[in-house]
Amino acid sequence: MKINSEVALVGNQIILVPYKEKHVPRYHEWMQSPELLEQTASERLMLQQEYDMQQSWLNDENKCTFIVLDKQKWNDNGNNEIESMAGDVNLFFNDPDDLHVAEIEIMIAEPSSRGRGLGKEALLIMMSYGISKLHVNRFTAKIGHDNEPSLSLFNKLGFTKISESEVFKEVTLKFDSNNFTNLTADVTELHYPIKTQA
């Protein structure tokens, strides 16, 4: 999505940056993990296919993707984005008849970045961005039956189950943006690339 191609969103523990070509090799490494492929319902791609996908997502106005940087690693590694990459967060506008509904996805791929609240903060910041900049009024999420960490996280944020698919072995959850007032996202929007310490 072009609208976020020069935007960085800085939170307390994370920095969201647009998914750029330089991020592809690390992202591709993550997506070799059978566990991550299963949890994200993804297929293994060749490196060139991953580069093509990154370009496709950049130009697709129905997809908003940010790479999640671990802010502690960012500060410790001299602002090195690649060494600070922790995962990604996405919004997909799948319904052409209702562009106010977005499917949200989160992946914290780096094991050392899990269990520290980075996923929660990434979701809150992305939801805030979706509501304020992209006019989202409802979020949906599709999560595998066996993905307990994600199910727990989304439930804690107030997402509620609307359906369950035995065929796809997943649960679909929803969250109405008028409930977002009960949640907070401490975020600063900066121009990307970031020039100084965040």
Swiss-Prot record:
- Please give one Gene Ontology molecular function term for this protein: N-acetyltransferase activity
Q: Which residues form the N-acetyltransferase domain?
A: 14-186
Report keywords, A-Z. Acyltransferase, Transferase
Q: Name one Pfam family in it.
A: Acetyltransf_3
Question: Which EC numbers characterise this protein's activity in its record?
Answer: 2.3.1.-
Q: Which residues form a coiled coil?
A: none
Q: What class of enzyme is it?
A: transferase
Q: Does the keyword Transferase apply?
A: yes
Cite the PROSITE patterns for this sequence: GNAT
Which family, according to UniProt? Answer: Belongs to the acetyltransferase family. GNAT subfamily.
Q: Name the chain's protein.
A: N-acetyltransferase 9-like protein
Species in which this protein is naturally found: Nematostella vectensis (Starlet sea anemone)
Encoding gene, per UniProt annotation: nat9
